[in-house]
From Swiss-Prot:
Subunit structure: Monomer.
GO biological process, one term: tRNA modification
Marked site (Interaction with substrate tRNA) residue numbers: T124, R146
UniProt keyword list: ATP-binding, Magnesium, Nucleotide-binding, Transferase, tRNA processing
Protein name in UniProt: tRNA dimethylallyltransferase
Reaction equation(s) it catalyzes: adenosine(37) in tRNA + dimethylallyl diphosphate = N(6)-dimethylallyladenosine(37) in tRNA + diphosphate
Function: Catalyzes the transfer of a dimethylallyl group onto the adenine at position 37 in tRNAs that read codons beginning with uridine, leading to the formation of N6-(dimethylallyl)adenosine (i(6)A).
EC number(s) recorded for this UniProt protein: 2.5.1.75
Residues annotated for substrate binding in this entry: T35, A36, S37, G38, K39, T40
InterPro entries: Dimethylallyltransferase (IPR039657), IPT (IPR018022), P-loop_NTPase (IPR027417)
Binding residues annotated for ATP, in chain numbering: G33, P34, T35, A36, S37, G38, K39, T40
Originating organism: Acidithiobacillus ferrooxidans (strain ATCC 23270 / DSM 14882 / CIP 104768 / NCIMB 8455)
GO function terms (MF aspect): ATP binding; tRNA dimethylallyltransferase activity
């Protein structure tokens, strides 16, 4: 079994801080990648080889009842390989990057106290950023400006406001879908209210406790698109349409984040009789591919110690190599061609 160095030789993030206890020096591992890139499969294979506690980093998996369309690990799998921060909120209960950071830090501390490795697995880049760097300090909400944007959206439509956002802040617009009204509204509210781009107005406050290193999955696009289609077909066979009907019967507000999640949003439109099943299927696939593209764009801006191509047959063994030999300040591309 791998024994972890406790002499400070592993990679350290953040400002200098008092010496940590030996167990606090167990490095946390971030396993990050776009949707359908095989993160869960790789995580459980790693858990077969190392004393790992899996902690989910997914803004949709926190919600109960959203199971099939979110590709949530099955209950049977979670009984064998427990996943923290899954099914911890009702869909109408608020959750945020700040709350996630509090919950994740607690889970990391518990894992280290037990002498286990915290493995944080997911695709929600903002949650990873909040956990690593602290909470951002964006300007507060501006109700008057928000009301004005809502009125404009009613006449011009959210895609038009997204185009306006792309003119004012191309970087922010690239990470937001044209129909994601909540994020478009907030982005424009910040930019128009502060006169700054999102990155200019954002200031991160906080540090990560103890050592940390990051592994980013970089799948080939054609392979990922094929997996997205295959996974969606599996979801439909597993009863995704029944899940849509069940969620509709619960009468959740349509503007809730979970209700507007990729895949769900398109099939709620079908359930309401506004499109055909074939149209919903194609729209859901297209939206999922766009989500994967946005996630990949986010992770390309992240620094990491390792990059891994999950399409490789030996991806699990390569991941084990990465997880058992952290290097101070080095970057490796094991099993991934960045050329």
């Amino acid at each position: 079994m791998q024994s972890w160095a406790t002499d400070g030789s592993v990679f350290f993030l953040g400002r200098s801080r008092p010496p940590l206890s030996p167990r606090a020096m167990i490095p946390a591992i971030f396993l990050m990648g776009p949707t359908a890139s095989g993160k869960t499969e790789l995580a459980v294979r790693l858990a077969d080889a190392l004393p790992i506690d899996i902690i989910s980093v997914d803004s949709l998996l926190v919600y109960r009842h959203f199971d099939i369309g979110s590709a949530k690990p099955s209950l049977a799998l979670r009984q064998q390989y427990p996943h923290a921060l899954v099914d911890i909120r009702e869909p109408d209960e608020p959750y945020s990057a700040g709350l996630f950071r509090e919950d994740a830090l607690h889970c990391i501390a518990l894992a280290r106290e037990r002498g286990r490795i915290p493995l944080l697995v997911g695709g929600t880049g903002l949650y990873f950023r909040a956990l690593e760097c602290g909470i951002d300090t964006l300007p507060p909400a501006n109700p008057a400006l928000r009301q004005s944007l809502m009125a404009l959206a009613e006449t011009a439509g959210w895609p038009a406001l997204h185009q306006r956002l792309a003119t004012l802040d191309p970087e922010a617009a690239a990470g937001i879908a044209p129909h994601d009204r909540q994020r478009i509204q907030r982005a424009l509210e910040i930019i128009l209210g502060s006169g700054q781009t999102i990155s200019g107005a954002r200031h991160w406050q906080g540090t990560f406790p103890g050592p940390l290193y990051k592994i980013i999955l970089r799948p080939p696009r054609s392979w990922l698109h094929q997996r997205i289609t295959q996974r969606f077909d599996v979801m439909l066979n597993e009863g995704f349409l029944d899940e849509i009907a069940d969620l509709s019967a619960r009468h959740y507000a349509p503007e809730l984040p979970a209700m507007r999640a990729v895949g769900y949003r398109q099939y709620f439109t079908w359930h309401d009789g506004l499109c055909s099943a074939a149209e919903a299927y194609q729209a859901a696939l297209a939206a999922t591919r766009q989500l994967a593209k946005r996630q990949d764009t986010w992770f390309k801006r992240e620094s990491a110690h390792y990059y891994l191509d999950p399409s490789r047959d030996d991806a699990s063994s390569l991941l084990l190599q990465m997880a058992t030999r952290p290097r101070q300040g080095e970057v490796h591309s094991i099993g991934w061609d960045n050329g």
